[in-house]
């Protein structure tokens, strides 16, 4: 089975649009690329219901969409038999993580992605961001500390782009990858389209054998399932024969491929 569990509903011009027509475009693209099931995982800070947990202008400027409408669109697609799952990409927000989890708890998610883009209000995947305030070693240390905190919170099911800190090809001389229990890791092809030019995560993060999903981080239908041949090779090289399939925040294992 091939799943793509990380994508964002957009129109052909990459504008946010939470509509059944947009869902259908992504579903058609998935079928054309041999992807059996897709999951929509919009950024949590796009929804006004979560407004009170955000502090950065980047987040609050985008916090204008209706979470209930987004959920209903994906649920309607499911009712119509489309092979889609309902999810969100849940950002690390430190002390506000419990509050954010409580806001999201009433909704019927199939899974929740966890990601770390900001630490103490400074971006990891944008420059200058945290890179202007801390050494490379310190950025990585703080990044993985946040990843571990998010993974151990019980609030997310899958970690998105788990070693995002490598995005600009700046790495410590020695990287200590943390033990991450209780969550799956996505093998993401998005890194191939970033300055690092690599899949997320590094093979070393898969050595302990955590459950995996596959992800494109598509913002347009053309990127659904993109470079998944390389993602599958990466997974098999690490010893994987199955992929996690989620429903109602419960995972089962299905044969990979």
What are these regions (language model features)?
Residues 1-12, 171-257:
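Charged catalytic cores and adjacent phosphate/nucleic-acid-binding surfaces used
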Residues 18-29, 95-103, 141-150:
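Short, acidic/polar
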Residues 2, 31-32, 72-81, 101-110, ...:
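Acidic (Asp/Glu)-rich catalytic clusters
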Residues 1-4, 37-39, 83-87, 110-113, ...:
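Structural preference for beta-strand elements that scaffold enzyme active sites
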Residues 23-28, 67-75, 144-147, 202, ...:
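Generic structural signal for well-ordered alpha-helices
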Residues 7-9, 42, 86-92, 115-116, ...:
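A cross-domain feature marking catalytic cores of carbohydrate-active enzymes
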Residues 107, 114-208:
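Domain-core and long-helix interface of multi-subunit machines
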């Amino acid at each position: 089975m091939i799943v793509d569990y990380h994508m964002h509903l957009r129109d052909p011009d990459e504008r946010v649009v939470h509509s059944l027509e947009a869902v259908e475009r992504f579903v058609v693209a998935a079928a054309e690329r041999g992807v059996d099931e897709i999951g929509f995982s919009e950024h949590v800070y796009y929804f006004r219901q979560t407004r009170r947990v955000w502090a950065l202008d980047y987040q609050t400027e985008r916090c204008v969409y209706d979470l209930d409408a987004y959920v209903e669109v994906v649920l309607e697609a499911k009712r119509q038999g489309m092979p889609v799952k309902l999810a969100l990409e849940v950002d690390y927000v430190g002390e506000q993580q419990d509050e954010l989890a409580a806001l999201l708890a009433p909704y019927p998610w199939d899974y929740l992605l966890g990601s770390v883009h900001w630490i103490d209000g400074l971006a990891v995947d944008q420059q200058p961001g945290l890179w202007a305030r801390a050494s490379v070693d310190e950025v990585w240390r703080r990044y993985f500390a946040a990843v571990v905190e998010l993974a151990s919170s019980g609030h997310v099911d899958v970690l998105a782009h788990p070693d995002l800190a490598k995005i600009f090809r700046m790495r410590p001389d020695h990287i200590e990858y943390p033990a991450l229990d209780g969550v799956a890791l996505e093998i993401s092809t998005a890194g191939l389209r970033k300055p690092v030019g690599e899949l997320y995560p590094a093979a070393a993060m898969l050595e302990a054998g955590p459950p995996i999903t596959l992800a494109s981080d598509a913002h347009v239908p053309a990127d659904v399932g993109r470079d998944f041949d390389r993602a599958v090779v990466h997974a098999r090289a690490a010893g994987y024969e199955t992929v996690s399939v989620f429903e109602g925040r419960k995972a089962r294992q299905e044969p990979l491929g």
